[in-house]
Amino acid sequence: MKKYQFLKSNLLQNQNINELFLQYLKNDSNIGVIKSIVDGVVIIEGLSNVKAGEMLQFSNDIQGMALNLNSETVSAVLFGDETKIKPGEYVEGTGNIISVPVGMSLLGRVVNALGQPIDNKGDFPGSELKQVEVKAPGIITRQSVNEPMITGVKAIDCLVPVGRGQRELVIGDRQTGKTSICLDAVLNQKYENSKNKKNALYCIYTAIGQKRSSISKLVTLLEKTNSLEYSIIVAATASEAAPLQYLAPYTGCVIGEYFRDNGKHALIIYDDLSKQAVAYRQMSLLLRRPPGREAYPGDIFYLHSRLLERAAKLNKNFGGGSLTALPVVETQAGDVSAYIPTNVISITDGQIFLETNLFYNGIRPAVNVGLSVSRVGSAAQILAIKKLAGSLKLELAQYREALSFAQFGSDLDETTKNLLSRGNMLTELLNQNRFTPIPIENQFVLMYSGIKGFLTNVNNKVIRSYENELFNRISNYSVFNTNVILLSNNEYYKKKNNNNVVAFFISYFKFITTNIFGFSAK
């Protein structure tokens, strides 16, 4: 572009000079002239050698991306303010597909969709540039999911487990707690990383189309809990251009891939992909691409599949790293059969379905256990939890079935009453406040006490008190804590001589339930 800097935009208004400049373009295919600007889409003459997805440089430091490559013109989208450029000005093709900085120096930082810092903390020393659009790992490089990714949420870790390298969709209506579940998973990694620093899990939170105030609250929460030190936030707010909201998930993904490809572990949250799809639909319609179902373009499935396929667990020959994805999709009135939800459900390895009715009934998180599923996570679930999960799922399924019949009549037999009472107790046991992740060891002890019948005669109103007291005892009683950690270890169930530990648990549960609240344990 430097050799054309003498051509100012006011000179280009002259017809003869404009024609002369277009002749220059035939000899330099990296320079183009703006023909028109409409709704953030720029039509450019020239740029005959430009690539699809190439970064373009406009005047006033405005950047854009080439998308539609026609025989005479190129259609590009802008990443900045379109009022700062005008027809007749020149455009330069950089020759590079969009790249962003990646590396350990990004930890604790907030960046925009182009990887530029927006937290006033300076640049990223020691970082390297990576293209945002790369191919997903092949079959040979992958390994089946075999390590748990502990979220700290009882309902998920016990019933819908997530493994490192898995894609688990979080789906539900607005204001049902989707973001809270994802943030609980981020907050819980502080405890998990302290137990095993070698296999620490780094977190990337990608905010797409959210309010600036929401992102500010998120940063404050992570700073207060000292969780920002292992986290990176990629933000494309609602006020930013649609191309930036479209690009943000790919930027977050390539940042996560840096950890995966270097033998480390990362978790990426896309909150949410519905807004990315809307941004891509807006871009496609402005680019005059043919609309399809719900006015989305024909390649909307590929938009999400090529993104989510990049989450993987690599085998040891390729470093053994992993990238776990928690994409979020918003539904309208619980309709999971809409276009985007069905697309993402078919791509992912399972879904956590949040229901509005459960949320309004005070069940938090509002996970519908019957509709939620994890297709590969159970292979990575801790064996101690897995032993309990089978009984827990069965009892909750029987409870839901009995509950549906109980509403039709008041005359219930004793067995059904006991089933409903026990189901209510287990449901209350799975309740959990947001931003309070629970260590997996504590989850095991709590669920063990419920499933093995120690809370059968307990009033549901005091279960939360029991839970708090139990966790206090675990943290203060060193012998008990040792056995808890032993039980959470996969090696525990591979040993035959574990009767002493089980007997210790039983006696201790009876002590707590009998002496703390004054009721008799069975």
Curated annotation (Swiss-Prot):
Q: What is its main location?
A: mitochondrion
In the record, what terms sit under GO molecular function? ADP binding; ATP binding; proton-transporting ATP synthase activity, rotational mechanism
Which cysteines does the record link by disulfide bonds?
none
Do the record's keywords include Lyase?
no
Q: Where in the cell is it found?
A: Mitochondrion; Mitochondrion inner membrane
Name the GO cellular-component terms. mitochondrial inner membrane; proton-transporting ATP synthase complex
Q: Spell out the residues of the site Required for activity.
A: 372
Looking up InterPro entries in the UniProt record yields: ATP_synth_asu-like_sf (IPR023366), ATP_synth_asu_C (IPR000793), ATP_synth_asu_C_sf (IPR038376), ATP_synth_F1_a_nt-bd_dom (IPR033732), ATP_synth_F1_asu (IPR005294), ATPase_a/bsu_AS (IPR020003), ATPase_F1/V1/A1_a/bsu_N (IPR004100), ATPase_F1/V1/A1_a/bsu_N_sf (IPR036121)
**Which controlled-vocabulary keywords does the entry list?**
ATP synthesis, ATP-binding, CF(1), Hydrogen ion transport, Ion transport, Membrane, Mitochondrion, Mitochondrion inner membrane, Nucleotide-binding, Transport
On whether Ion transport is a keyword of this UniProt record, the answer is yes
According to the record's subunit comment, the protein's assembly and interactions are: F-type ATPases have 2 components, CF(1) - the catalytic core - and CF(0) - the membrane proton channel. CF(1) has five subunits: alpha(3), beta(3), gamma(1), delta(1), epsilon(1). CF(0) has three main subunits: a, b and c.
Matching entries from NCBIfam families are given as: atpA, PRK13343.1
Q: What this chain does, per the record? A: Mitochondrial membrane ATP synthase (F(1)F(0) ATP synthase or Complex V) produces ATP from ADP in the presence of a proton gradient across the membrane which is generated by electron transport complexes of the respiratory chain. F-type ATPases consist of two structural domains, F(1) - containing the extramembraneous catalytic core, and F(0) - containing the membrane proton channel, linked together by a central stalk and a peripheral stalk. During catalysis, ATP synthesis in the catalytic domain of F(1) is coupled via a rotary mechanism of the central stalk subunits to proton translocation.
Q: Could you tell me what this protein is called?
A: ATP synthase subunit alpha, mitochondrial
Look up and give the organism this protein is from.
Answer: Acanthamoeba castellanii (Amoeba)
The gene name on file is ATP1
